[in-house]
Amino acid sequence: MRFQDTKDFRKSLTKLPAHVQLQIIAVLENIEQATSFADIAHMKSLKGHRSYYRIRVNAYRMGLYWDGENFLIESIDTRGDFYKTYPPK
């Protein structure tokens, strides 16, 4: 599956510890190799938001938007702060 990331996501990623960055890179590779949603580990849809998903990476959550063809990776934050700002209102 194809994906794009936002400038905010890349900026947040650079602020994370190195071991978490490596795990997130592995998740991004998993998304590229996936042929269906079921192939992407730890991905769940957000309740009440049809096109928004999250992926768990230890204590962090990645926010994704599915436009029908591609994923847009919009956000990454700690679990506690992630749900305060994602999905965008």
Cite the ranges covered by each PLM segment.
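Arg/Lys-rich, positively charged N-terminal/basic patches that mediate binding to nucleic acids
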Residues: 1-27
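Residues that recognize and position ribonucleotide moieties
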Residues: 2-3, 53-55
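Conserved short hydrophobic interaction patches
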Residues: 27-30, 79
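A short, surface-exposed loop/turn module that caps and links secondary-structure elements
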Residues: 29-54
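Enriched for short, Lys/Arg-rich terminal
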Residues: 40, 57-61, 65-89
